[in-house]
Amino acid sequence: MQKANIDGKVWRFGKDIDTDLIIAARYLSTSVPEELAKHVMEDADPQFVKKMSSGDIIVAGENFGCGSSREHAPIALKAAGVAAVIAPTFARIFYRNAFNMGLPIFELQESAEIAEGDEISVDMNNGTITNKTSSKVYKFIPIPQFMQELIDAGGLMNFAQNEIKGK
């Protein structure tokens, strides 16, 4: 494992944030990550890209990433600099797409206790999230080793290329 901790400021979103809210269908004519990043979450919060900083963390309600299957959603989040997404549950196809694109996501039932603006630290090795603002510590089930390897490689394509090269 490369990076054991993710530290960032929290941006809150509600439940059932679908892939069309993450990146609207009107932007799907491009697959250029930098272009997608300019419009991430704009239908949920038009100022999100202007307010957030690279390394910030989205904390949302249940069923994050529901709706249509589009790899553009995790690509846009990652390209915008979102370091991780935390929610009680994720739509299964988004869950898989996020790891395939190298975006760390974590399931935390108590995510509603984390407020917008809080500073948190995710310890991927030990399965803890520390809210530096409230001093609360939460436990989550660490992601499986193979999925951590996908994150470390930057996604499935990079992982496969590294395997082919024998790294």
Swiss-Prot record:
Q: Which Gene3D superfamilies match?
A: Aconitase, domain 4
Pfam families attached here? Aconitase_C
Relate the protein's function as given in its record.
Catalyzes the isomerization between 2-isopropylmalate and 3-isopropylmalate, via the formation of 2-isopropylmaleate.
Q: Which reaction does it catalyse?
A: (2R,3S)-3-isopropylmalate = (2S)-2-isopropylmalate
Q: Name one GO molecular function term.
A: 3-isopropylmalate dehydratase activity
EC number(s) from the headed UniProt entry: 4.2.1.33
Q: Which UniProt keywords apply?
A: Amino-acid biosynthesis, Branched-chain amino acid biosynthesis, Leucine biosynthesis, Lyase
Subunit and partners:
Heterodimer of LeuC and LeuD.
Entry annotated with the keyword Lyase: yes
Query: What protein is this chain from?
Result: 3-isopropylmalate dehydratase small subunit
Is the keyword Lipid biosynthesis in the record?
no
The family assignment reads: Belongs to the LeuD family. LeuD type 2 subfamily.
Q: Which species is the source of this protein?
A: Sulfurimonas denitrificans (strain ATCC 33889 / DSM 1251)
User: Which NCBIfam families would you find in this protein's record?
Assistant: LEUD_arch
Q: Which GO terms describe its biological process?
A: L-leucine biosynthetic process
What pathway does the annotation place this protein in?
Answer: Amino-acid biosynthesis; L-leucine biosynthesis; L-leucine from 3-methyl-2-oxobutanoate: step 2/4
